[in-house]
């Protein structure tokens, strides 16, 4: 996960190339799918195993398996690895009997990879966002990603590596 380059078209045409993407494609195509889903308030996602084509995350779907976005980022990433391994083994075992499904491109959403400066939480956010929204922004930007931060007086950055949130 985290592949940021397009595989050359001549490779895609010559070989049966597949990829795992941590979103329920066609939704959340492109970069930073985990962060974008959590920031958008999604609670559930899916790992999608798909056949690569020339477009970004737009190939035919081989398998798609749901997983929860709840918990800290380490837990979420662990679930993604577990589901991705399961789907890869399933594909290898059933390779000659795969039933690929076309993506509904009309339902596609495409996101760019988040930039470190987008990890900033502004003081105004505490007046406009809910506690859950701020918590989600902090937890989806835990290591190994650029952590959420607040810029303090004098330009010093206070990094927010973890938050706890209690629903009432």
Segments predicted by a language model, with ranges:
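Donor/substrate-binding cores of folate-linked one-carbon enzymes
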Residues: 1-110, 120
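Internal anion-binding site segments
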Residues: 103-168
